[in-house]
UniProtKB/Swiss-Prot annotation:
Mg(2+) binds at E39, D68. This is dITP/XTP pyrophosphatase. Pfam families: Ham1p_like (PF01725). Pyrophosphatase that catalyzes the hydrolysis of nucleoside triphosphates to their monophosphate derivatives, with a high preference for the non-canonical purine nucleotides XTP (xanthosine triphosphate), dITP (deoxyinosine triphosphate) and ITP. Seems to function as a house-cleaning enzyme that removes non-canonical purine nucleotides from the nucleotide pool, thus preventing their incorporation into DNA/RNA and avoiding chromosomal lesions. Substrate binds at T9, S10, N11, A12, G13, K14, S69, F147, G148, Y149, D150, K170, H175, R176. It comes from the Bacteria. GO terms for molecular function: dITP diphosphatase activity; ITP diphosphatase activity; metal ion binding; nucleotide binding; ribonucleoside triphosphate phosphatase activity; XTP diphosphatase activity. Its cofactor is Mg(2+). Belongs to the HAM1 NTPase family. Binds 1 Mg(2+) ion per subunit. It comes from Nostoc sp. (strain PCC 7120 / SAG 25.82 / UTEX 2576). GO terms for cellular component: cytosol. One of its GO terms (biological process) is nucleotide metabolic process. Homodimer.
């Protein structure tokens, strides 16, 4: 039986990635109503993901899934962090600001973090998972795929930026991919226990 899962985002890129991660499940993903805005007031990725999932679930009366993710740059004391999406108006502005702030800094170590949360229709958080991908910030963008900071986030083990990776490769190594890999077994267990 297919269950509706409201995705607490208006970001079409995130929706497509989530649909790919959950393709072989009994969940049908749909975007949240555009007029439903949830302000990200949390100071951690986990608190923001839980807040968004809970608010959207309560407002729609459906199960809801949310993620909060961002880039933490070691030399910038973890910034942009939870402010990653608000570091500029466009992807280009965000990348430019980050590269300007890093300047000629030698330590380019960084990590992408993703926390995914699922809330039941009453707003209670049913599941939560985290994924982390370590990498480095390049001095200039490379690649045309992906979105956000993907063109400047380089994964040394793969010798590619996120923007140079195929969707399949990115899915297997990214912070979001790792979070969903941790979440899927929990979702399957939850569905089987609720079916009993």
């Amino acid at each position: 039986m297919t269950k509706i899962l409201i995705v607490a985002t208006s970001n079409a890129g995130k929706l497509r990635e989530m649909q790919a991660y959950l393709a072989n499940t009994d969940w049908e993903l749909t975007l949240k109503p555009t007029e439903l805005e949830v302000e990200e007031t949390g100071d951690t990725f986990a608190s923001n993901a839980c807040l968004k999932a809970s608010e959207v679930a309560k407002a729609t009366g459906n199960w809801a899934i949310a993620d909060d993710s961002g880039l933490q740059v070691d030399a910038l004391n973890g910034l942009p962090g939870v402010y990653s999406a608000r570091y500029g108006k466009t992807d280009g502005e965000r990348i430019s600001r980050l590269l300007k702030e890093l300047g000629s800094e030698v330590n380019r170590q960084a990590q992408f973090v993703c926390v995914v949360a699922i809330a039941s229709p009453d707003g209670a958080i049913a599941l939560q998972a985290e994924g982390i991908c370590r990498g480095e910030i390049l001095h200039a963008p490379l690649g045309s795929g992906g979105f956000g900071y993907d063109p400047i986030f380089y994964v040394p083990e793969k010798q590619l930026t996120f923007a140079e990776m195929t969707p399949e490769l990115k899915k297997s190594v990214s912070h979001r991919g790792k979070a969903f890999a941790a979440l899927l077994p929990k979702m399957a267990a939850m569905l089987s226990s609720s079916a009993e």
